[in-house]
């Protein structure tokens, strides 16, 4: 779903509309320029580049005069990245790479941030930190589109939630409504 929204895949049916404009045929880099950024499953940071170089790569749509301020904002949100700014990204822990992937996406100043399985492979304490950051971003006005297997964590931050099965929406509601749903509790929350 996220690869279709971000222009990496083309929909066979339907359309993707963002801010009233159909994105059919719009190249992925132009979608980023329109205010959308994706943090892919598995992070996909530039492993041979430093933390700071990775962040600069995320700012390619921004004027050069704003890049330093953008990096400072990311370091404020992710202090661990500031400590590691000259370190090669491939040597970071999984949690640090997830922070870097999120920070790189934030460098483009997105209106819509798409996160694909941000908790995948992370220790529980890091999952909690990542979801705290997701809450902070949402509170600050960034719209978040989250795809996440950890239903409890995802529903705890969701204004709206959808359960997809084989590409079709089978349930929808607020995060609280789905958390209270017997079907969701039985299928996804172990109850």
Region spans (language model):
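Glycine-rich phosphate-binding loops of nucleotide-dependent enzymes
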Residues: 1-191
């Amino acid at each position: 779903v996220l690869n279709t929204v971000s222009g990496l895949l083309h929909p066979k049916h339907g359309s993707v509309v963002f801010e009233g404009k159909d994105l059919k045929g719009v190249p992925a880099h132009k979608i980023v320029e329109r205010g959308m950024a994706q943090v892919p499953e598995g992070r996909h940071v530039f492993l041979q580049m430093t933390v700071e170089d990775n962040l600069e790569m995320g700012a390619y749509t921004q004027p050069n005069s704003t890049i330093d301020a953008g990096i400072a904002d990311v370091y404020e949100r992710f202090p661990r990245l500031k400590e590691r700014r000259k370190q090669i990204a491939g040597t970071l822990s999984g949690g640090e790479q997830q922070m870097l992937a999120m920070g790189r996406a934030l460098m483009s100043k997105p209106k819509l941030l798409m996160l694909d399985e941000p908790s995948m492979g992370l220790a529980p304490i890091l999952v909690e930190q990542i979801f705290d950051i997701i809450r902070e971003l949402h509170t600050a006005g960034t719209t978040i589109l989250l795809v996440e297997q950890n239903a409890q964590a995802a529903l705890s931050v969701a204004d709206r939630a959808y359960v997809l099965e084989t590409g079709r929406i089978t349930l929808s509601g607020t995060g609280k409504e789905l958390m209270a749903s017997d079907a969701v509790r039985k299928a996804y929350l172990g109850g």
